């Protein structure tokens, strides 16, 4: 039994701002659909919360503390049957600086 290997590009996106992440996902999906590839997603992954506990006072008041948190929002987009035109369009795509992108072929 021979299985046909299907070409796929997996794009993982991370950002602190959810709206910035969603607009970047829309741009990627629109670009993939315009070039003839099929895009599956964006698939939301669990949001990571990182909480930092800091003393409010520089001196002895250990009971007075302040909490800060960062939330990292993540998405996955799978692009099936990408052509060379699709890859060129994705490389030329201008995305905001606050979005971290990881691409796997």
UniProtKB/Swiss-Prot annotation:
Protein name in the entry: Small ribosomal subunit protein uS10
Gene Ontology molecular function, alphabetical: structural constituent of ribosome; tRNA binding
GO biological processes: translation
Keywords noted in UniProt: Ribonucleoprotein, Ribosomal protein
HAMAP family given in the database record: Ribosomal_uS10 (MF_00508)
Quaternary structure annotation from Swiss-Prot or TrEMBL: Part of the 30S ribosomal subunit.
Organism name: Arthrospira platensis
Any GO CC annotation of this UniProt entry: ribosome
Function: Involved in the binding of tRNA to the ribosomes.
Pfam families to which the protein is assigned, alphabetical: Ribosomal_S10 (PF00338)
Alphabetical list of InterPro entries matching this protein: Ribosomal_uS10, Ribosomal_uS10_CS, Ribosomal_uS10_dom, Ribosomal_uS10_dom_sf
Gene: rpsJ
PANTHER family in UniProt: 30S RIBOSOMAL PROTEIN S10 FAMILY MEMBER (PTHR11700)
Record-linked PROSITE patterns: RIBOSOMAL_S10
Similarity annotation: Belongs to the universal ribosomal protein uS10 family.
